[in-house]
Structure formats: C-alpha cells, structure tokens
C-alpha cells in the first residue's frame, strides 16, 4: 500500500522500487515505529482527532504488532510495502479499516522516521555500552591474571622501556572508558523527540509534543521542525563513536597480533578464536584479531559515506537521507561483533611471562635508568643522556648488556658512575621507580587496577 499516489497516473517501476524501497533494511526499526505510533495515537485522541474507542482499537492492534515484531514473527519478505511505516499502516488498515487510515493524521514519514531512528539509536547505545564494559572487564581480568608480568614497552615498534603487562591492559581500559563517555554524551544530545514536526513545518493539530516526548523517554521535543526532520547529526555521532572505538580495538588487535607472532612469542591465543591453514598444518592464525582490525575500515567507510551524503543537502528532508540507515545498522552490528570477540580473545590469552621478561630486559631498555642515575649524581640530564648513549655503544661493541659491562669500562666513560649503578640497571628497579600517578610501577598499577575493578562494579 503506497502512502502516496493520488496525483500519480501510474505506479512505480520495478527498477524504481529497487532503489526506493527501504523495508529490506528499515524493518529492524519495526518495534520503534510501532512504539512511536502508539504514542501518536494517544496524542491524537487528546487533541480530539480520535475518539477514545478509535484510539483503543489502534493501540490494541499496534500492541499486537509490536509483540510480533519483538518476537521476530512479522513476515517482511512476503510484503511489497515500501518501508516499515507503510508496512505497519497497511497491517492496521487490513485489521481496522478506516480507523487505521486515521493514524497518520498530522504526521509525516519525515518526523516519523527521525523518531524511529532516534529510538533505535538510543536502544543500541545501552547494548553497546554493555559490550564496551565487557571488553573492559576482560582487560581487567587479564591484568589480574598476570599482575606481576613485565613486558617490553615500545615506541616506533622498538623496545623502549619495560612496563607491567597490567599497565598495557589499563591503557586500553582508558581508551574504552572514553568510548563509554562518548556514548553517554551522544545520548544526551540526541535524546530529543522529532514527532509532531510534520514534513517540515509542524502540524496544524494541537498535539502535546512535550507529552509525546516524555512518553517515549525523550528529555524534550526538538525545538525546530525544519531541523528535527533533517538532522542526522546523531547518526554521524554514532558512526564517529563507533569509528573511534573500532580504531581502539584495531590497535588492540595489532598489539596482540604482534605479541602472538613467532618473532615475539609473548602470548598464546585460545583455539576458539584462531584458525588454521588449508595448506600448512602447523599454522595457528589470529584470524579473529585480523578481522577485528579489518572491519575497522568498513566502519570508517560508513562514517565517511554519510558525511559526504549530508554535506550538500538543503533544508529540510531529502530522500538522500534514506542512505543513513544501512551504514549505521551495519556499523552497529560490526561494532557489537568486534567488541564481543575482543572479550573472547582477551579471556583466552595466556601470557608467556618468562619470555616477556627476557625480552623486556633486552635492547638496552635500562639506558634511561642510567641517565637518571647520573642526574642523581649531579650530572645535567642532557649530559647524562649523552653518557648513557656512549655506554650503549660500548655494550654494542662488546656484545653484552649494559649491566654486564665491568665498572672500569663504565668509569672510563664517566667517573660519576660508581658501583651502586648495578642495582639501578636491574629490570624491576626501572619499572618500580616509576611510582607516579599514571606510571608503570607495581604499586601504581596495582592501585589503578583495583580502582578500575571498583569502577566496573559500580557500572553494574
């Protein structure tokens, strides 16, 4: 049943229907569309457009449809309707006749779809928030399992300074906490109700938009009808939050792919999140992580696509905006999948703590400790930095670690170096000296870990 057509002499071509019809994807918003229609029917009754009996019949039929939608029992494949709005209205008319035809009084699909989409996004903010918290929990559990472990810290993918593995886990916790904050901010900004804005100019019927907004769980009605029907900032923000979070997951995946490699060998992944090779029997590939990294580009593409779509649109609604949904729906699905698989990967990993420790001590990662030691002896840091660099060069020439150089070799470079330098050059010393807020010492990391576990409990 077309929601338009009185001024047309022929129907839509099959090719036009292919490009125009959105039911194949906007069917996921069936429950939200029906929820909005129930509220609209109540508003129409209060405005004197519907009788109490008509509204009761509409709400009863809509409630039955919503129960079917929530149970996944609506048959969209057998329908030739254009979109979810016409699908629901056709079902009402089939059941109620002319009473069903009254529901759309004063309403446009423009304010209807804007309301549906906001309800859908708001619902998924809650579920995605839970998914992000799940990854945070898995990171904290991994940190707790390997609380004493020391791994190499990297800059430029070169060994730089030793850090606690838990410190690495907590770095990703910080990133994901920002993702949570962005989701919360998005909910605040997008939680306004467009319903009652009509096609673009509002409606002539005296509906109570504040009551509609409150009933649907919005903080307030949208204040400008033109903006209400043409705003897709909330979708762009959702895609940006998803893109940022997927970027964090991609970095996490990249780190773990490297740590899992034969060259590093710092950790092993569980069989449940890896795959083999059709040719090479020995292979155990980190496919879950690689796909998590690969799907990041897919999500970025959805954000870029909608930005380009929206950039040239005049006020108010344009059909271009129908292109907002497929990318957003796919993004939410992919983000959800990646968050869930990230949790599984983290829960499955086992750290090779001894190999990590050996690697953390290599690459002259204690050179900064030597420079800091010299500062303690009254040497300006820049001079100490130069001295430490020459010590590293000496160790390279002799094929040994800094701490294995005899004191005579060290003192030949600087007479400020004394026998008390050797404890300073030990692995644990350098790690635990960084006992400052945000640092990698055992004490600081333990406090941070317990604080984050406490925060997680408060999140529920």
Curated annotation (Swiss-Prot):
- Name where it's found: Cytoplasm
| Catalyzed reactions per annotation | 2-(N(omega)-L-arginino)succinate = fumarate + L-arginine
Q: Which UniProt keywords apply?
A: Amino-acid biosynthesis, Arginine biosynthesis, Cytoplasm, Lyase
Q: Which Gene3D superfamilies match?
A: Fumarase/aspartase (C-terminal domain), Fumarase/aspartase (Central domain), Fumarase/aspartase (N-terminal domain)
Record carries keyword Transferase: no
Q: Which GO terms describe its molecular function?
A: argininosuccinate lyase activity
The protein's superkingdom reads Bacteria
One Pfam match, by short name? Lyase_1
Q: Which family does it belong to?
A: Belongs to the lyase 1 family. Argininosuccinate lyase subfamily.
| Primary localization | cytoplasm
* Protein name per the record: Argininosuccinate lyase
Q: Quote the cellular component terms of the Gene Ontology held in the record.
A: cytosol
| CDD domains in alphabetical order | Argininosuccinate_lyase
Q: Which residues form the signal peptide?
A: none
Q: What's the EC number here?
A: 4.3.2.1
* Cited NCBIfam families: argH (TIGR00838), PRK12308.1 (NF008964)
Q: Name one GO biological process term.
A: L-arginine biosynthetic process
EC class, as a word, reads lyase
Identify the pathway: Amino-acid biosynthesis; L-arginine biosynthesis; L-arginine from L-ornithine and carbamoyl phosphate: step 3/3
The top of its lineage is: Bacteria, Pseudomonadati, Pseudomonadota, Gammaproteobacteria, Alteromonadales
